[in-house]
């Protein structure tokens, strides 16, 4: 990969207090040959896209989207390894970091943001980092994705440790921000994984684990927010959900650590207890109240026939796994 020249950009990071912190960052602009990348090649099925009717457009898009799960199926062993590493990180008090730019970064932030309400975990447990910071979630930040230095700064700001897992995400597989983050993570001693939509990608080679999905050319040439973005989202779903399930955040297929932040979720919590135990709604509601709002504790109380205090002790001994807590002897 030949480097043509360097530029210095001034990036402004907006703090929670609304203050701006300026940073001059050197970025490398690459002379790239993108024509060999699957994500940049033209799709022969859509060469006449501009001549298609609305029904023809959505039909071909739907047919192309159907290829994504089949492509992901070829990467399941690698995705399962990422799930294992994430679960191990959580059990050691570590965290899961997603790193990406543009659409890839936004998808990481989106998946991370869903973990606290779904699994009742602190927002610091799964962190989405996007090149350029929060502003980049809604608009492009010039030069951000081309800076390895920014990635290192972002990870240092979160005090990265060897107990964490860093997952780099880039459809092209060559984003400098992601490469910089993976290299720094390896120097810290983290497990590292890469999600790309080109085989033999730079980030795949840089990471300890490569998850490379060949979804074929995009319907709209080079628009990786389409099939590539869909593939990335499905893989992130698997990593976050699988690792949370492995660490006791589900009983059967129920979200037993769901946070009750609105009326719909209060009702869902009651339904989860009913589904898990078979009790009537009034009894489920009473158990949740006695458990201080904890669905997991309420289920353990009802299935182990114990009070909230004992249920909490059982869950602590079982490291949060309801099934194991129910089987424990009376404390």
Residue ranges and their predicted role:
Residues 27-71, 75:
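Cofactor-/ligand-binding subdomain signature composed of acidic, glycine-rich
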Residues 60-68, 128-139, 251, 292:
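Gly-rich Lys/Arg/Thr-decorated short loops/hinges at beta-loop-alpha junctions or inter-strand turns
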Residues 3, 7-13, 17, 33:
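Short, positively charged and aromatic/hydrophobic N-terminal segments
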Residues 97-235, 241-247:
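Glycine-rich phosphate-binding loops that contact phosphosugars or nucleotide phosphates
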Residues 94:
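Glycine-centered, small-residue-biased loops immediately flanking beta-strands
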Residues 74-89:
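A short, well-structured juxtamembrane/interface segment
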Residues 243-331:
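Short, amphipathic alpha-helical interaction segments embedded in low-complexity terminal/linker regions
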């Amino acid at each position: 990969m030949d480097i043509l020249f360097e530029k210095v950009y001034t990036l402004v990071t907006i703090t929670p207090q609304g203050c701006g912190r300026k940073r001059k960052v050197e970025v490398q602009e690459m002379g790239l040959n993108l024509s060999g990348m699957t994500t940049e090649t033209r799709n022969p099925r859509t060469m006449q896209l501009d001549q298609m009717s609305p029904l023809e457009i959505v039909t071909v898009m739907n047919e192309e989207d159907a290829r994504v799960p089949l492509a992901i199926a070829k990467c399941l062993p690698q995705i399962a390894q990422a799930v294992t590493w994430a679960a191990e990180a959580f059990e050691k008090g570590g965290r899961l970091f997603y790193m990406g730019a543009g659409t890839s970064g936004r998808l990481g932030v989106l998946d991370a943001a869903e973990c606290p309400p779904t699994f009742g975990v602190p927002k610091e447990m799964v962190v989405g980092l996007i090149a350029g910071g929060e502003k980049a979630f809604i608009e492009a930040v010039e030069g951000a994705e081309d800076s390895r230095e920014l990635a290192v700064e972002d990870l240092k700001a979160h005090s990265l440790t060897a107990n964490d897992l860093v997952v780099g995400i880039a459809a092209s597989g060559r984003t400098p921000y992601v490469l910089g983050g993976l290299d720094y993570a390896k120097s810290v001693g983290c497990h590292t994984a890469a999600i790309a939509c080109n085989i033999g990608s730079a980030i795949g080679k840089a990471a300890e684990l490569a998850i490379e999905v060949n979804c074929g050319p995009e319907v709209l040439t080079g628009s990786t927010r389409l099939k590539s973005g869909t593939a990335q989202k499905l893989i992130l779903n698997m990593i976050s959900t699988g690792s949370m399930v492995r660490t006791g955040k589900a009983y059967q297929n129920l979200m037993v650590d769901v946070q009750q932040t609105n009326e719909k979720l209060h009702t869902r919590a009651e339904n989860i207890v009913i589904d898990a135990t078979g009790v009537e709604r009034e009894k489920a509601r009473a158990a949740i109240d006695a458990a201080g709002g904890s669905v997991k504790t309420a289920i353990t109380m009802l299935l182990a026939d114990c009070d909230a205090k004992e249920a909490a002790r059982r869950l602590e001994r079982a490291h949060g796994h309801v099934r194991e807590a129910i089987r424990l002897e009376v404390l």
